[in-house]
């Protein structure tokens, strides 16, 4: 991967004290590959160290998809989807990459799987009316391993959250707002503008006070949310075991072959 490829995978724009990061793979429904993780992760890190950036907005290019999750073609090529120098930042260089600056997801379309996990990792979420959210990994014999499997339970009533986890079914933006998963639902085509407007309300305040509020609210120590670390450890242990199962191989294979999976429970 060249530096130019990594740079093109996400567009960076400054709007006053707000940095806008746009995942720039509309032809692939903004699916995450290694280039996206590098571009997004590096942009976040620069924003965190820049005293003139007071908030960050993340969105997807185009008007169909915010992020379709992991790039299955990249996975089939055995491409590393994570930042090569900062694997600890997690999926998209984002989901385990805490920054002091407030983050806002402008969900301009479908946000299934990893797209929902990016939204869950954001402080605030603005979504277009046609947006949808969900964690469909169980339909492929997998699990929402970018933090979604435990964060969804923090964001929704438990019964609602586990229904989404167990069925893999999506919910609309309206339902996501009703349950408190997102902050605002706005007309299609206006999610980014609405997110920037929300960022403006945040950046109207004293930036250091906002950053302290964020760190204390999340219980951050040495750049990580301390209460989440045992859950990440448990998730990684469970995923390693799951990936050795026949079902974990059958799900992606059936998807690639466009047929119903045949589960064996082993």
Description of each model-found segment:
Residues 26, 126-131, 182-230, 246, ...:
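C-terminal long alpha-helix characteristic of the crotonase
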Residues 92-100, 106, 112-166, 179, ...:
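CoA-thioester-processing core
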Residues 1-63:
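Conserved CoA-thioester-binding segment of acyl-CoA-metabolizing enzymes
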Residues 63-67, 112, 217:
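Short, active-site-adjacent cap segments at secondary-structure transitions
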């Amino acid at each position: 991967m060249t530096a130019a490829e990594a740079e093109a995978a996400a567009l960076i724009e400054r709007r006053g004290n707000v940095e806008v990061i746009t995942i720039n793979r509309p032809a692939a429904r903004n699916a995450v590959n290694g280039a996206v993780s590098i571009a997004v992760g590096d942009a976040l890190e620069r924003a965190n160290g820049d005293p003139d950036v007071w908030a960050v907005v993340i969105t997807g290019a185009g008007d169909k998809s915010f992020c379709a999750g992991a790039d299955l073609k990249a996975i089939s090529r055995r491409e590393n989807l994570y930042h090569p120098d900062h694997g600890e930042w997690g999926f998209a260089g984002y989901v385990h990459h805490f920054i002091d600056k407030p983050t806002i997801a402008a969900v301009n379309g479908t946000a299934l799987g990893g797209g929902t996990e990016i939204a869950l990792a954001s402080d605030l979420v603005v979504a277009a009316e046609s947006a949808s959210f969900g964690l469909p990994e169980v339909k492929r014999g997998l699990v929402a391993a970018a933090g979604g499997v435990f964060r969804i339970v923090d964001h929704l009533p438990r019964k609602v959250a586990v229904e989404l986890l167990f069925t893999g079914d999506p919910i609309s933006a309206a339902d996501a707002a009703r349950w408190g998963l997102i902050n605002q639902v706005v007309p299609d085509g206006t999610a980014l503008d609405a997110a920037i407007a929300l960022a403006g309300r945040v950046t109207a305040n004293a930036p250091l006070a906002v950053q302290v509020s964020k760190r204390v609210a999340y219980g951050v120590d040495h750049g990580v949310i301390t209460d989440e670390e045992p859950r990440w450890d448990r998730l990684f242990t469970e995923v390693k075991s799951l990936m050795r199962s026949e079902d974990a191989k059958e799900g992606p294979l059936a998807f690639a072959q466009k047929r119903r999976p045949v589960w064996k429970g082993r």
